[in-house]
Amino acid sequence: MEKKRLHAIYITAISVLGVTALSLGAALIATNLPESPKSGMEQYYDEKVAAFGMENSNFSRGQIVFIGDSITDLYPLGDYYSDLDLMTYNRGISGDTTKGVLKRMDVSLYAIQPTKVVLMIGINDINGGVPFKETSNNYKAILDGIKTNLPNTVTYCMSILPMSDKILEVAQVDIPGQNQKVREMNEEIKPIIADHGYTYLDLYSLVQDENQKLRNELTDDGIHLNSNGFAIWTNLVKPYLM
C-alpha cells in the first residue's frame, strides 16, 4: 500500500515537469502555469489539504511536521524517523509553492501545534518564474505565521536544492541558470530565517556535484531525491529532531 501511495505521488510530481518555453529560453514547471495543466495540480493540492484536515483529528499535538513541495511529499518519513520519541507528520504537497504553503498554514501546522517544523519550499517558485521579491515576501510571511501562532515551535529551514541534467530527459531546462537562481534564493532566505531565530540547514552543499548540480546518484529524475538523497537529508536533520 505504501509503495502504491508513493508511486502515485511520484507520478503526480513528475507531471509538474511539463514545460513551456520563455522568450529567454528558460523553462517553467507546469505547476505554476495558468493553462490547463495546472488544474490537475490544483485538484491534487485541494485533495491533500482536505486529507490533512481529516487527519488532524487523529494526530497528536506537539509532534514534528515536515512541510513543503513534492520533495517533501515523496519523503517516506516512517522509513527514517520511526525511532524518534516524537511522531513525524508529512505535510508536503507536490507542485506547491511559497504561496501555496502560506494558504494552508492553519490546516498543515497550526491545527496540530507541532513542537518542531522542517520546512523546504521554493523550487517551484524559481522554476515557475515567480519574482524573487514575491517569493522572499511569502517565505517571510510563512515564518511570521509560525512565530505568531506557534511561538514555542523550533523551526528548521532547509536550503532549496539544485537540479541535475537528468531532468533534461523530460523537460528543456537551463540547468546552470536555474541552479544559479536557487543559490541566489538560498542567500535571500538566510537572513529572513536568522531574523526569526530559526535554523538554516544547508542541504544543497551536501547533494551538489563539482558543477553545483544535484548529484545524479541522488535523484532518478533530476529534481526529486531518491533513497540515497533522502538518506543524506535524514543524516543532516535527524540530530536536530532527537
Predicted regions located by residue number:
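Cell-envelope and extracellular/periplasmic
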Residues: 92-94, 121-126
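N-terminal Sec-pathway targeting helices
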Residues: 1-20
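Active-site segments of SGNH/GDSL-like serine hydrolases
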Residues: 123-126, 144-182
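Catalytic His-Asp segment of secreted/periplasmic serine-dependent ester chemistry enzymes
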Residues: 164-242
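Generic structural signal for well-ordered alpha-helices
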Residues: 105, 139-143, 186
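Serine-esterase "nucleophile elbow" of acetyl-processing enzymes
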Residues: 19, 23-113
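Charged helix-capping and loop-helix junction motifs
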Residues: 132-142, 182
